[in-house]
Amino acid sequence: MTERNFLIELGTEELPPKALRTLAEAFSSNFEAELKTAALVHQGIEWFATPRRLALKVTALATGQADSVVEKRGPAISAAFDAEGNPTKAAQGWARGNGITVEQADTLKTEKGEWLLYKQEVKGKPAQELLSGLAAAALAKLPIPKPMRWGNNEIQFIRPVKTLTMLLGDELIEGNILGADSARIIRGHRFMGEAEFTIDNADQYPAILEERGKVMANYEARKAIILEGAKKAALEVGGIADLEDELVEEVTSLVEWPVVLTASFEENFLNVPTEALVYTMKGDQKYFPVYDAEGNLIPKFIFVTNIESKDPRQIIEGNEKVVRPRLADAEFFFKTDRKRPLVDRLPELEKAIFQKQLGTIKDKTDRITELAGYIAEQIGADVTNAKRAGLLAKCDLMTSMVFEFTDTQGVMGMHYARHDGEAEDVALALYEQYMPRFAGDKLPSTGVSAAVAMADKIDTLVGIFGIGQAPKGSDPFALRRAALGVLRIIVEKDYSLDLVDLIAKARAQFGDKLTNANVEDEVIDFMLGRFRAWYQDEGHSVDVILAVLALRPTQPADFDKRVKAVSHFRSLDAAESLAAANKRVGNILAKFDGELPLAVDSSLLLEDAEKALAEKVEAMIATLAPVFAEGNYQQALSELATLREPVDAFFDNVMVMADDEKLKVNRLTMLNLLRNEFLKVADISLVQK
C-alpha cells in the first residue's frame, strides 16, 4: 500500500494565547487516536500552531485501510442442527443476518466445543473517505471550556473558522468542518508576505507558509527565536532577561513572525518597587524585564513584535510610549500611598467583605492577629511582631497600588511597612504571608512570617468549611493550596504543632458565625487528604501513606517522620512477612469479643515458639520505649523487623485459637502487645511489598 503525507490546517480568528499549545497538542493526540481506531498506519504527527491557525502534518500515512477478515461466531453446532442434521431456525437466522447460507459457514473448534463461524472479508476503505470525519472528530474533542458561535449557524468552536485545507499528498480531501469547506487556500501574515496563496502538496508545508506567507508555523521554532533573541538582546545592554517560561509561551502564541527588540524607560521609575514595575511590564504589556548581575532591575525591557519593520526605531518608540503612562501610574500610586501609614487603613477593611457569612476583611484581620500570636508562641517566634503583622496583613488591599495592580498585594504591604518604620520581621511577614503560593514555591523565611501565613490559611479553611462550603469540583477560595501550604510550613520547618489544637483555636475566633458542627473533623480530614497527593509526588508509595493515615496522626511533622520510616521499613527483607503477620493478627483480634489483659502470663506459655516470642516482645517493648519517646520511628521499625523469625516460628508451630480459653487469651494478649508496638508507627498490615 502506498504512503503519502497528510496536511490539515484550520485557519481561524485569533486564538487564546494561553490555550494555544494545549489546543495544538490535544488536536495532535486526538487525531492520532482517531487514526489508530480507523487502522490507518502512519509514521508520525507534527503539530503547528500560530495565533490564527492549528495544523497537523501526518508523515507516511497509508492511503487506505488494509483488507481484513472479521470472524463472526454463530450458534453452537449442537444448537445449529436438529437430530436429522437439518439447520435449525437459530442457524438459519444467523446465516441470513450475515448474508450467507448455513452451508457456506465454517466450523470453529475449541476445547469448549464447536460453533458455526463466518469469516467475513472486509475491504479496507481508502483514506480519502475517512480523513475528513476523523479530523472533525478530533476537533470536536478539544478541551474548549467556552466555545463560541458565529454567523447565523449553530456551529461552535473556540474561535470562528475562516479556512480549511486538507491535502493527502497533492490530492485535495473534500469536506466541511466547522462551517469551512476544504480548499487549497492558505492565509499568510496579516501585514507581510502574501495574504492568501495556493498550496499544491502537503509536502510543501510549513516551508511554503514561511516563504510566501511570512508565517513561522512551527511553535517551538518561534519560541527558540524569542529565547535566543531575548538573551542576546539583554547581554547587549549588560543585563539578564527575565524569561519566565509562562510568559515566553504566551508571547510565542501571540506572534506569527517573531522579531525581538529592546526598549528603555526613564531611570527615575526605578524608585518605584521593582515588583510594581515588573507587574506592569510582564502582566500588562507582555514585556521581558532586564536585571543586572546583582539582580537589580535596569531601565530596559525586551519585547517581541509580530512584524519585520524597515524602521524598528518607530516600533521601539511606540512601545516606550505605551509603557510610560503605566509606569507613571505606578509611581504616582506609590508616592500617594506612602502619605498614609498602613495602620490608618484598618477602618477601611470594615467596608470590604471577606465572605458574607464570615464578615469583613477587618473581622478576618482580627482573627489572624490572635491566631498568629498563638502560633508564634508555640514555635518560639516573637509574639508581639506576629500580632502586629497579623493586624497589618491586609491593609495594603486598601492602597491605590494594589487596587490597580492586584498581584502586588503583600509585596507592597512590605514596602509600605518599611516606609512606616515597622519592624523588619513585621514588614517581611506582610509579603511572606501568602507563601507558598504554588507547588514548589519558597516558604516564609522567619517564624513571624510563618505564624502569619499559617494563621491566614487556617482561618480561611476553618471559616469556609464552617459554613458548609468545602470544595468539590471548583475551589474558589484555594483551600487545597492553603491546606498544603500549612502542611509544608509545619513539616519542612519541623514545627511541633498539632492540627487539632490549631483548628480548635481558629474555630473559637469565629464565635457563633459557623454553622457546621463537624468543622474541626472535616478540616483535619481534608488536610490529611492533602498528604496523600504530596507524598505520592515525593515518591512514596500509596500503601505506605495509607498505613500512616490509618492512625490519623494530626501533627504534620510527626506524620512526615512516620511516612519516611515506613518507606524505609518497606524496603527491608522482613517487611512482607511482618506486614502479612500484622494483617493476620488484626483479623484474629477482630474476631475476639472481650477485653485482653495488659500483660502476658508466663505460666501459660507452653510451646517453645510462644515462649521465645513472648520473651522477644517483652524485651522489645522495653527497648522501644525511649525510641518512641524520641520519635525515632525508623529505628523502631528496624528493631521490630528483627522479630520476623520468632513471629514466623510462632505462627508455624502454635495454635493461637486454642480450645483452652486461658491459653487462647494469653496468646492473643501477646499478639496484641506486638501489634500495638507496630501501631505506634503505622498500620503495617496495609504495607504491600
Swiss-Prot record:
Pfam families: DALR_1, tRNA_synt_2f
Subcellular localization(s) per the UniProt record: Cytoplasm
A molecular-function term among this protein's GO annotations: ATP binding
Keyword terms, alphabetized: Aminoacyl-tRNA synthetase, ATP-binding, Cytoplasm, Ligase, Nucleotide-binding, Protein biosynthesis
Catalysed reactions listed for this entry: tRNA(Gly) + glycine + ATP = glycyl-tRNA(Gly) + AMP + diphosphate
BP terms from Gene Ontology: arginyl-tRNA aminoacylation; glycyl-tRNA aminoacylation
PROSITE patterns, alphabetized: AA_TRNA_LIGASE_II_GLYAB (PS50861)
Family: Belongs to the class-II aminoacyl-tRNA synthetase family.
Protein name from the UniProt record: Glycine--tRNA ligase beta subunit
Source organism: Photobacterium profundum (strain SS9)
